[in-house]
Amino acid sequence: MERKVTRRAFVQAAALSGLAAAAKPDWRARDFSAAGEKTAGNQGLTQFVEIFIGTGGHGHTDPGATVPFGMVQLSPDTWTGGWDHCSGYHHDDTSILGFSHTHLSGTGAADLLDVLLMPGTGPAHIDPGTPENPAGSYRSSFSHSQERAEPGYYSVFLKDYGIHAELTATARVGMHRYTFPADPASHFVIDLAHGIIDPPQRMHTNVISSEIRIVGSDTVTGGRRVKEWAPGRYIFFAMRFSKAFTAAEIFAESKPLGPSVREAQGTSLKCVVNCPTAKDEVIHVKVGISSVSVEGAMKNLEAEVPGWDFEAVHRAANEAWELELAKITIETSRLDHKKIFYTAFYHALVAPTLFSDVDGQYRGMDLEIHRLPAGAKNYTTYSLWDTYRALHPMYTLVQTERLPDMLNAMILMAEQSPAGVPVWPLQAVETGCMIGYHSAPVLAEACVKKIPAVDYAKVYPLWRKRAMVDDYRGLGYYRRLGFIPCDLEDEAVSKTLEYAYDDWAVAHLARAAGAHEEYQQLLDRSRNYKNVFDPSITFMRGRFADRSWASPFDPRGMGHSKKWRDFTESNSWQATFLNQHDLYEYMKLFGGEKGFVEKLDTLFNQSSELPPDAPPDIAGMVGQYAHGNEPSHHIAYLYAYAGVPHKTQARVRMLLEAMYHNDPDGLAGNEDCGQMSAWYIMSALGFYAVDPVSGNYVFGSPLFDRATIALANGKTLVIQAQENAPDQPYVQSVTWDGKPYTKSWFSHAQIAQGGTILMRMGAQPNESFGAAAEDRPPSFG
């Protein structure tokens, strides 16, 4: 049976439990300064990162300690049930369960939260309790006024125990520092049953198997296999304490196994280790993790944190973040803009996550153990339906040293996975979440931009199979009929449109491989979007197998019936502008440029009302434009193709100001592994990739007075906005290295050479800039 492929299942489960889409307080009315307080000595760019942005509302981010693209995300968990706890943490909560070592950043589906550790004093409890009923549990209350976070560091005071907890991390190791009060019964709880509880009423995660072993008097090792969103994934750990414990006991199904039992297997395992403490005594704990084995976790631990110097690990984590954040420097008089930008940059560098051990071993998508060539790294956590749009284009500018490994990891997945090419891979398991197969545009973009050290010869045969052979989620109908019938397949309109874009991407891979006939076939097929466009109403619309149009039709609705949704986390208003690659042909369907622009204007000026069954993913509304979900992200830039880029400039500047704020509820929707932030980064710099596969960017409205991007080839790109101001969003003129530049777009090849783009801004639009046909962005070329 096919697993549900969208995030809607998680949203619906949360709604049933009363935990989703509840009204939230106004964060801007709260004192956020204490949560954003920085540690002494943090004076670089990391001081501008407000990690709590996105931890409230529907942002779904966590505030914990990690390094760029780290395997470990060591963070507090406040609750693990309900849609708004996909990351394990929500800023509304007032108690902490403990600190687990893996987290998803901003997703709308939930998993991970592996290897929970919680310190305590007094009698040990092994029940996690609930936010509503914490009595007799190991959780503790806390206050945001006693909580701090910065890149690579988190701290909180656990009020119920009088313990100060601090966290930092390397790539594969989480390091804890706990300052205890005097107590002969101080202890730690290790909970291998902790994790996402879906549905929330179940009260424990779905563990297939787990094992735990007490080694000597200072080490605990183990692992588990979990059946949640990524069913059947493995995680192993090696945990070492700086102080020998005086006693240790394993619990199975909440029952103590006795002090003589040193190891156990089961589906609900916990362990309590006792460490009596004096006043202000510090105990360190370091935890290595691995998808391969306990031995792999121990190797990671010993290689990355051989000693007990917490501050050295903290400094190294901070320096790693400084190195990455320094790739883009900005000048602006508005501190909030600077904080939002560097927080967005931070969030954009969390995933994909490292997925190979220090010895090069990793678990493949066939669940077997493989070894990489020396120096190579493997990655996981690819939210491709989201991130192909802006995050991966951003990486081609600022992550070119990691990008080959990230791309080669996807090729390995396609070779090893029984599910074929990656869709939403997580820790060696294909979740199958969301539609399309948008690893294709990521690899096609890299091929077009000539990203080196990638084995492109392997790519086309693997992705060709999905495009030309696989009977995958309606692709058989799509190939035979040119569209997917909405009475035979759920979300048929969105699937048709996204397969058309994937065809466009695979066509580029075919051309690179010399498969010229199939290149043309795929190119032609990428115009299948026409087959779900109803010219009588100028909307994308569901179509039955007999080719008749689905009724009833409401462009705000999710589909033509409660049984059959026609759109994926969107409606017809948003799907009607999903076209990214064939804009000039597409405009003809609206009667030309004028009709297309009028339709775009109407989208933004419509009522924002949605039907009751609309998922909360459709958020951040401006008319029927939904910035809180990815299908809308390129839409404001489409005006440039119709010769009116000044409308793009006005819309983009408005979205930059309205959809991002310096507070916990500061995102318009899910962060989605960096995509929501990448839109902000690219747009604030002044350009965006409407069609990433083309290798081109469209000008928007730069937010900063000056931005400098350090390119990997040693060159720099400077974007300077002259006479920039909140009421001056319009581009009056552009010069490139001092020469007049009249186009509303540029290519990746151009900016890869560096240079200075000077944009003179004004309060009134210059309607001649970018208006001429020869100055508009290319499309389908």
Predicted stretch roles:
Residues 1, 21, 34-35:
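Short, low-complexity interaction segments enriched in Ser/Thr/Pro/Gly
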Residues 1-18:
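N-terminal secretory signal peptides and thylakoid transit peptides that target proteins
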Residues 22-26:
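Hydrophobic membrane-targeting alpha-helices
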Residues 32, 36-441, 447-497, 505, ...:
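Accessory carbohydrate-recognition regions in carbohydrate-active enzymes
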Residues 502:
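ATP-dependent phospho-/nucleotidyl transfer catalytic cores
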Residues 717-725:
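Short aromatic-glycine motifs in intrinsically disordered, low-complexity regions
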Residues 730:
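Extracellular attachment/recognition segments
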